[in-house]
Amino acid sequence: METTEDVAVHLSERLSVTVAEITVRSLARSLEHWEKSPTKVATVMFKVHPSCVQEKPAGDQWYIPAMGNNRTCRRLILDTHFRGLTPLNDSSHLQTSYDCIAISGLASHPFGSWQPKGDDKEFMWILDKLAHGEQSVRAILFGYDTKLKDSTSFQGIRDLAKHLIDQLQANRGPKCETPLAFLAHSLGGLVVKQALVDLAKNRFDIGYQILRDAIRGAIFFGVPSQGMEVSAWKAIVQGQPNEIMINALSSTSDFIPKLTKAFNETLPEHCRFFWAYETEVTPTAITEPDGQVARKGEAVKLVSEDSATCGFIKSDPGVTIPINKSHSDMVKFCEGSQYYAIVRASLWQVLQPTLLQPDDTDYDAQYLLSRHVESNNRKAFEFITTQHDWWAKSRTP
């Protein structure tokens, strides 16, 4: 399948949905490079639920059998969870290519977290601006499960970081040197920082070294380098196994200071980072009478400017980005957002610092962080349903 039109026709035949009710938003080669017959991954929006979903509406992944006796036709996988790595495009072979990994935050959806709130789900900036607009950048979503209510998971940030490393190593290939950068929101940024620390500590592992050398840096959005306000979340997860995760995010936790210190000490010299911070309060999460979790509680500042910028708002504001949105909304850029151009320019400074900065200026990330440390020593596919549309991811032969 070579075009989005091909995918729409194929899905129509396999799912008994008319082509007019299917919108294929992206098509990319699967990251599973070891396959003899490579598959492709598409992000798709349906105007009506396919019958397989209607039969099992509580699911988040469905298998559609192959058609007849055609051996070239594989079983189709449809999912709305987007867990693991999901490529949104293929980078151009005509120029130097880069990978950009987008990682959402706590209790988030890998795709929906980057979309504006509301019924209109036509726009998602990482797909529609980054993936479709930058031919040399391959945009990839990293999804993981950190739901709050009724969770049975006791995974921690170290576990998530190890899973991120495992996914990147497995899907990029053992000798892949394609430069990569991260767009990371909230908890996602702590996962990236822990992964970088772990890559540095295992310096004798060749695979870890190759991956570490490929990483160019990140743009962090509201990442709590000094902890964050978690009292509302604590009330929701009290007594659950995932309580350990929420406690680790607290401003009184000893985990984050240790992670920040280790990150500062092991940071690769070739990396560069930008730090975005929210400037609006955020409604806290509450449990409603029907048992659903909703952001309808008291509005508070979840992550302070100092915490979100690792202190650079005072020591080097040039690497900080103020975003006049709440903690949740700060990555939900609408179409035409004033912030995309800023993030795009910052991303290219991460990916191509030598092309964008004067040769005689030291923009070394280690230098920036060491200044902050010295200063401190002198005084730290959602199941997206709307009235009209439904998003999903499809793997096609």
Predicted regions and their residues:
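Short coil/turn segments at secondary-structure boundaries
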Residues: V7-H10, E55-D60, G112-G118, S151-G156, ...
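Conserved RNP beta-strands of RNA recognition motif
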Residues: L11, E35-E55
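RNA-recognition motif
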Residues: V19-P38
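C-terminal catalytic-base region of ester-bond hydrolases, centering on the histidine
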Residues: P38, C176, W233, T266-P397
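Short, surface-exposed "cap/lid" segments of acyl-processing enzymes
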Residues: R83-S136, L199
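Serine-dependent carboxylesterase/thioesterase catalytic core
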Residues: S104, R158-P268
